[in-house]
UniProtKB/Swiss-Prot annotation:
Catalytically driven reaction(s): RNA(n) + a ribonucleoside 5'-triphosphate = RNA(n+1) + diphosphate
Protein name: DNA-directed RNA polymerase subunit beta
SUPFAM superfamilies in the record: beta and beta-prime subunits of DNA dependent RNA-polymerase
Assembly mode: The RNAP catalytic core consists of 2 alpha, 1 beta, 1 beta' and 1 omega subunit. When a sigma factor is associated with the core the holoenzyme is formed, which can initiate transcription.
PANTHER family to which the protein is assigned, alphabetical: DNA-DIRECTED RNA POLYMERASE I SUBUNIT 2
Pfam families: RNA_pol_Rpb2_1, RNA_pol_Rpb2_2, RNA_pol_Rpb2_3, RNA_pol_Rpb2_45, RNA_pol_Rpb2_6, RNA_pol_Rpb2_7
Domain of life: Bacteria
Assigned EC number: 2.7.7.6
Amino acid sequence: MVYSYSEKKRIRKDFGKRPKVLDIPYLLSIQLDSFKKFTDQDPTGERGFEAAFRSVFPIKSFSGNSELQYVSYKLGEPVFDVKECQIRGITYAAPLRVKLRMVLYDREAAPGTVKDIKEQEVYMGDIPLMTNNGTFVINGTERVIVSQLHRSPGVFFDHDRGKTHSSGKVLYNARIIPYRGSWLDFEFDPKDALFVRIDRRRKLPASIMLRALDYSTQDILDLFFDRVNFKIKKDSLVMDLVPERLRGETASYDIKDSDGSILVEKGRRVTARHIRQLEKSKTTELEVPVDYIEGKIAGQDYIDPDTGEVLVSANAEITLEDLAKLSMAGIKEISTLYINDLDNGAYMSDTLRIDSTTNRLEALVEIYRMMRPGEPPTKDAAEGLFQNLFFSEERYDLSKVGRMKFNRRLSIGEDEGSGILSKEDIVAVMKNIITIRNGGDEVDDIDHLGNRRIRSVGEMAENQFRVGLVRVERAVRERLSLGDLNELMPQDLINAKPISAAVKEFFGSSQLSQFMDQNNPLSEVTHKRRISALGPGGLTRERAGFEVRDVHPTHYGRLCPIETPEGPNIGLINSLASFARTNSYGFLETPYRKVEDGVVTDQIDYLSAIEEGRYVIAQANIDIDKNGRLLEEQVACRHKGDSTFMRGTDIQYMDVSPQQIISVAASLIPFLEHDDANRALMGANMQRQAVPTLRADKPLVGTGIERIIAVDSGVVVVAKRGGSIDYVDASRIVVKVNESELRPGEAGIDIYNLTKYTRSNQNTCINQRPCCSVGDPVVVGDVLADGPSTDLGDLAFGQNMRIAFMPWNGYNFEDSILISERVAQEDRFTTIHIQELSCIARDTKLGSEEITADIPNVGESALSKLDESGIVYIGAEVKGGDILVGKVTPKGETQLTPEEKLLRAIFGEKASDVKDSSLRVPNSVKGTIIDVQVFTRDGVEKDKRAVEIEEMHIAQAKKDLTEEFKILEEGVYGRARNLLLNAGFEQAQLDAIPRSHLLVQTIDDEAKQTELEQLAEQHDELKADFDKKFEIKRRKITQGDDLAPGVLKIVKVYLAVKRTIQPGDKMAGRHGNKGVISKINPVEDMPYDENGNPIDIVLNPLGVPSRMNIGQILEVHMGAAAKGIGDQITAMLEEQRQLAEIRGYIKEVYELGDEVLQRVDIDSFTDDEVLRLAKNLKGGIPIATPAFDGAKEKEIKEMLALAKLPTSGQRTLYDGRTGNEFERKVTVGYMYMLKLNHLVDDKMHARSTGSYSLVTQQPLGGKAQFGGQRFGEMEVWALEAYGAAYTLQEMLTVKSDDVNGRTQMYKNIVDGNYQMQPGMPESFNVLLKEIRSLGINIELDQD
């Protein structure tokens, strides 16, 4: 493999043994592609805005004299960029403008004669735009729209599993689910009659539906039944014989063949042999006794030819009397329905008998009554309602997916078709459910991923946009019908508010629009790849059963079987598997390699769950030779959801990668194959809660996917084009682009501005640091700057800690963790948290609030950190209770005493009419002010601080743009200089020419002269562009802010808090091994090894066996080896060994392992590159052990041997307090530990006095409300059991809801009198009132 310059800085040794056939696709593509389809122009009109507009327009007036037509749309440019929107707290959105055409028809002339046409562009609201990282900025906060897994439109057949009826009989049902419109259900009742329901309302016999579709009784019988024909003889009947129909019957007469010989005697069962004999003898008719027809059902009406009387009506049972009547009337042939209890039930015939309707109108009226009970039906109303239910394109749409699923399920040829239902569709569904009831077909599995599809951002936004358009449509239609249309323009007809409201509601408050989890890069990526079954049109967690939540065989390679929440949402919220994608229909697909005749090809096909069922698929870890031929005789494979063994030649596909089945979070766990699934789930979930540490530390033992996640998440800065680093500082990187990658006539400079110390959604710190130096060569995709939780482009949200598994004085009881003081001193787990505190000055009824340093009754010391505007300085260190922004609020006028009046008369208006409402630092918070933002309403005078901040921003913007301009200008001059040198100018000559004159020189060569003129043009463009950009920036900075109504000014203060690790903080490994720090031990007391190196963290060995997460032990051993190799390299460097020796050792390390595919050609590295690599490996060689394809035990031992460590992975440790050797050897190594976002500082809380609940008068609960600790029922039992009567009394009275008692108690404590007088608890009064509300008079008898 060829490594770029930046990749050579640190190479991760990979133990993967399977070749990489397919790279993991871009992780955020599910979000970006979906939204792109929504916003991109689509000429076909099948999706996005185009589809929504075409479905609603043209809008015709009721009279038909005018219509509003859609022409085209365009999305404008957003006013502010993403960062500005976040700072200002506004939505990152672009205006949508639509060109509409209003057509007026001439009433007097021929129909369709156009009288007037008006075209105009109309504003239709702002549409939120997606950022490059797949998020939306809504009201200044980053949000993610989670994709939804919902039931695909189409037709589904199911049964009730025998739960509906007491007999336990299985009742089948069919449901046609459209994308939009009414649901249509068919179901059997316990008596085997077929019923229909519309939108889950009252059920009606299914034949009513057919009658409403204009089928007569005769048509219905013809549709659903075969016929048996009888010829009437004198004293017998001759039946047309279809031998197959006799199978399984007991003969009620002798069955003879055409020769008259008896094949089946009366009373014998007809077997398959008898049927073969009948077919062989070519018998077509069979004589049967007359009573055989009794009870059979007539297939049509039989009418007396003379009188016209109906002798036997269709669907009536035939009796012997009926037969005699028919015979007398001269009818020679009778047709009956073929009904057989085994495989041809009389369901439709029974349904017709319970149907009271006889014609179409009656059926329509019955449906109208069911849909609109209480309304009097008219013919037109009934017709209109039924027509609109399933046959109107405005009200009903199966969608492309629904039609495809419908046609495939009912084996109708093509996948295309109309979005509405036809008569034939409804009949086909009824026929199919009857076939299922007859045992001829299977019901569907609704948890199969072929029946559930993904609805992503774009689709949901389009649906919501369409909802807004439909609201507008009604209003437009009304306006077209009223008023003088000659005066109106399209703009006057359209009100954009309903559209904006619908879109805003979706992005702002939909269940699937979620506040982005921004703890670390992994949590961002996972949140964007989340698939939820909840949300509008989805499931609810209360109703979701076990089957929906369970892992289904079709999840393989599509949804991760490991990563899901642990609580009530388990199984309802899933994560996309690493290689999965959605197809054009919205179904999940996963890639497979094609196998032909036992040979694996390089062809890769993406298969959906439906397609996968047709193939035999082998796993990725099967043995193949170098030509791709399968080596095993019997290969483990999957077919139709079952695991089995088959011959190599029968295999049709194989997996592309062992990590195919798991999500990105699960594939970050090394040695995942050795962990129990439950613990792996916890490990995957807890990695998302890891807080970025102050100094990121790459994991020594990784899986090789760390770089992919870091790059795809967008937190690192990646080179867009190749070149070399021209300039680097903490906030900017400038790359001089390679000549080969230049676009014609550009300066060839790429500038990357870095994000510095900004706040994430979870209050963690986002900061980017350059990881390149001036002069470094760069290729496309190189990481130029690390973001939060990344180290040289690798994801790094924890620290490599030296671990020992041993008990230590009970301090690791029940998963507690003992850590060394050194860890805290070295700031290994120190994190920075940035809080945003806001102070809002409003316009109140009594006057305006004011932000000022002139605050009543506040001492000088409290104001020491404020400037003259009353706003805290940047850099000030503040603690709980300090004033950040001084604010005074007008008080209501109070009655003044004569003395006060006198004082006011003497001293004028005093500050007594305002109260202090300043913004203070919350209790228990201590930190540094890192930024202040002031937003002032338009028209309100800016204070001094706001002006200063503005000037600072303008100066910064000017500095940035000037530097950018200088760099670009230098690029232009540099190219001009080269051009002039090539044209024959001398270097000395060029040095004498002033820079500004370089571009106006004349050259004899015409082509070069043209090129120089182009450069001069480009320079002028750059200058104009600089002026324009600066003007835009200046205008943005100086313009007033659009604040909420009644708000005059907002001051936002950003407070950075440094949190070191401390007892009570939660930590975890990557294998679900979590615990809480119990003690921070002095370094000298920690166990140490024979070299005197102390242990950093002591974990409990009892936490491993029962949890079955053995992966952590292998990680510790491999970590020890990786660090040991780093120590060996460090020793070599310190001893200044020969570079050849160091090169040899590094080469040996990278070549270690069986069948390892990675090839690092260390010999091709220059000496400098080897030296830099060695320096970067001093802390340990990073290792990749991919999930299900990782390092084996033998390889770990080889690594330990190479690091000159005991291959057992255990060593002798000594007690730091006594110096004595511990009894037995201890497992010591390096584990990657994470600090989770469950910090004791955020949870620790104590209450003195505070607010109380209004009804019960008990203290509130929780830190946010400054609440008390709950003393619950079980705690009361505990005190009762101890007999602690006085403690119990004070708990239930003065410390809780005895209002008078607690007030008195407070006074007593203040006075130094420690006594209490308990009274009546308020909750007793609540109980009394509740009993009285039940109508029971209860009175308290107080003695």
